[in-house]
Regions:
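Transmembrane helix-loop-helix hairpins at the membrane interface
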Residues: 127-285
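Single conserved hydrophobic/aromatic residue that forms the stacking wall/gate
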Residues: 392-402
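Juxtamembrane helix-loop-helix connectors linking adjacent transmembrane helices
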Residues: 25-52, 56, 60-155
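Alpha-helical transmembrane segments
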Residues: 1, 59-68, 270-283, 336-340
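Short, non-transmembrane alpha-helical segments in secretory-pathway proteins
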Residues: 352-394
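Membrane-interfacial loop-to-transmembrane alpha-helix junctions, especially the N-terminal start
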Residues: 2-11, 183-185, 231-234, 289, ...
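Membrane-interfacial, low-structure loops and terminal tails that flank and connect transmembrane helices
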Residues: 73-96, 284-321
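Internal/C-terminal transmembrane anchor helices
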Residues: 319-342
């Protein structure tokens, strides 16, 4: 479970905290000018951290459950966290399975394209083009990073949660009652429905369009890859597929050559890992049984010998009462509070009107009378402060209008 937790921490940091920081230029669109800049930034940063921590726990629970169930249900699969390790990543089996995962991507794109052409023309399905990609990705600090980060979490988390957990659980439940195949078929249908419903928040008509769209790929693409190869290779297909879609704003835009290059490099990471281990060992290796799920050996817990606790009497002193860590945290807290007040715009100049509403309306009516202007019946006078209008280039009396 420790490797699952480490993987969850990496994805939570890479695809949540750093991704939100990457959109730093756009967070100012939600800036409330009634609060200080430091307060706004503090709220945003705390929100990013809180979201990352929450996502970490969700990812960790999903990864631990998926790894455990897969290990029990499919003993011939390569252990999830050994796929990209020495003497496994540089094997021809991993290379062939990875290439196969890449080759599925254009097939999946063709299936989705054909689905919408058929359903929109013959069955009235509708999906707005604006939901395909978000042009705001180009406003981020590193546009290439956005697609990679989103695809990493979507690819690996969704395959763990929507594929590995239900299918492996269905197999184990069916196996418990000597109905392994029946349990597998039921789990296949259930995971396809859940996967489609989980993506039904995109605007589309009818409301179940995404469920219908993803039902078949969930079974014949991702489901079969998981059964035959393992969850890692299904995640690779899912990851590369999402990278292609999320990077569309970059490829449709002129320039952005560095971002296009980084997007290609990011999409090739699974192959680059294999190339790295192949160059490191200078040969292709074979996957032995110890790297398969059936060869998994749990790490035995360390036995701790009971030791008599030593009673140490400490006398309070400045060295142990004023702990340096406590002092450091307190200083950071004080500096942060001071900065909040220091950067806050406490004094805001306000130019209040020098006359009241009734006086303003009286002046307006007098102006109409002096200029022999008669308004049709039904017009009512009202007054408002329009001193901030950009039409005024020099100080002038309050603008009083009537309508």
């Amino acid at each position: 479970w420790k490797k699952s937790v480490l993987a969850a921490a990496f994805v939570a940091l890479f695809s949540n905290v750093l991704l939100n920081l990457n959109f730093y230029p756009t967070i100012w669109m939600a800036y409330d000018t009634a609060s200080s800049k430091s307060q706004f930034l503090t709220e945003q940063l705390l929100g990013m951290v809180a979201n990352g921590i929450l996502m970490f726990f969700i990812l960790a629970a999903s990864f631990i459950t998926a790894e455990s169930l897969t290990r029990r249900a499919f003993p011939k699969h390569i252990q999830i966290w050994k796929t990209w390790t020495s003497n496994v990543a540089n094997s021809k089996r991993v290379l062939n399975d990875t290439i196969f995962a890449y080759l599925i991507v254009p097939i999946k794109l063709a299936l989705i394209g054909a689905f919408y052409i058929l359903m929109e023309r013959n069955f009235g399905f509708w999906s707005p083009a604006s939901s395909s990609f978000d042009p705001n990705y180009l406003a981020s600090i590193f546009p290439w990073y956005t697609g990679l980060a989103i695809s990493l979490q979507a690819g690996f988390w969704e395959e763990m949660l929507f594929r590995a957990v239900p299918i492996a659980a269905g197999v184990l439940i069916g196996q418990r009652y000597n109905m392994r195949f029946t349990g597998l078929m039921v789990a296949m249908v259930i995971q396809a429905l859940i996967f489609g419903a989980g993506h039904a928040n995109y605007p589309a008509q009818p409301s179940y369009a995404r469920v219908v769209e993803l039902f078949l790929p969930s079974i014949v693409v991702y489901g079969m890859i998981y059964l035959r190869l393992g969850v890692v290779f299904g995640a690779i297909t899912h990851y590369v597929y999402d990278v292609v879609l999320f990077s569309l704003p970059i490829w449709y835009s002129s320039g952005y050559m560095f971002d296009k290059f980084m997007t290609v490099i990011g999409g090739l990471i699974p192959l680059l890992v294999i190339l790295y281990f192949r160059m490191k060992h200078q040969k292709w290796s074979d996957v032995d049984s110890s790297s398969l799920n059936e060869g998994f050996v749990p790490t035995p817990p360390e036995e701790k010998t009971a030791e008599e606790p030593e009673v140490v009497s400490t006398v309070p002193s400045a060295s142990n009462v004023l702990n340096p860590k406590i002092i450091g945290i307190a200083l950071i807290f004080v500096i942060g509070i001071f900065s909040t007040f220091k950067l806050s715009n406490v004094e805001v100049p306000v130019n209040s009107p020098s006359i009241d509403k009734e006086k303003a309306i009286s002046i307006a009516n007098q102006f109409l009378s002096d200029n022999n202007i008669t308004l049709p019946d039904g017009y009512n006078a009202y007054a408002f402060d329009d001193s901030s209008c950009l039409l005024y280039t020099s100080p002038s009396p309050r603008d009083v209008r009537s309508s």
